[in-house]
Amino acid sequence: MIAHCTNVVTEGTARKFARGLLFLLLMVSPLAWGDVALYQAVVPLKSTAEADRAAAFGEALRIAAVRASGRRDAGDAAAIAAAAADPTGYVQQYSTTAERMLKVGFDARAMEQLLQQAGLPLWPSERPTTTVLLFVPAIAGGTRAVTAAERPPERLEIERAAQVRGVPVTWPAETVDAGTARARATSAGVTGAVLLGTAGAGGYDWTFGHAGQSARGQGGPAAGLGLAADTLAARYAPGSTRGLSTVPVRIGGLEGVRSYAALTTYLDGLSLVRSVSLRELAGSTALFDLGVRGDLELLRRIFALDGRLTPAPRTEAATNGQEAPDFVWQP
């Protein structure tokens, strides 16, 4: 029998403390990413019967595997399907709502091991926030953009899909014209993402933009969100996340003890970082060995989301026998 708990413990005390400090440190600047709870899911519950609850636990586990890996077919992997058939060893907490929905939290360590057994990658919880620019049919003809103050059925469908895939989304506070929306979608940088959907005779035409790249597709609202999730997962959940590696990273811009403490707290709070070891400290530059689920390129991409660690200028040469840093800390 699974205990009905009230709290989810997904990380060690030190890491939870670090992530809390990271949140406080970054509150002073707007975040371009959302911190997604990877191993949680909300699913319908047919009844309070044990068989229905077990089936709901299994469905929630499949959804958690999709959220954590970024792969829409993760639930079909043999190891995931076997775990979903007997999920009790993975469930850490659950609760039910008045709407007969089951909220389930899974053990993070057990789920991460399960993803590895299934040969699935890991999509870190720091994910770009996607601004949705959705143009729905207007009563007077043509289309109009959905704003944050509105909740048409299409928005609800997108948000349900975003919950399943683990994609943080936001909506424009004010109306946007079609030309501006197209420009934003095709010119989105590394700090944010834009999903543009325009209603047409055969459904919706979708354009997703992030990091200077764009992808296109067609289909309903859920298909548009799926395009965004698949594109982001391809960038942030590479094959290197299937295992652990040690990545040496040289970081400059450390102007004192407080700066160094803030940096180490930041690094330890990142979800793909498993360990932070200082190898060398010289002047304002530190060389760390980071144990990560991924590689240096993924670290670069995650760092770029909030700009706290920026690539060191290529023109910055080594001085006094000290190697040039890879990144510069922005306190």
Located regions from the model:
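Amphipathic beta-strand/beta-sheet edge segments enriched in Tyr/Trp
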Residues: 40-42, 46, 183-227, 287, ...
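Signal peptide-directed extracytoplasmic domains
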Residues: 75-136, 147-153
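C-terminal soluble interaction/assembly domains
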Residues: 236-331
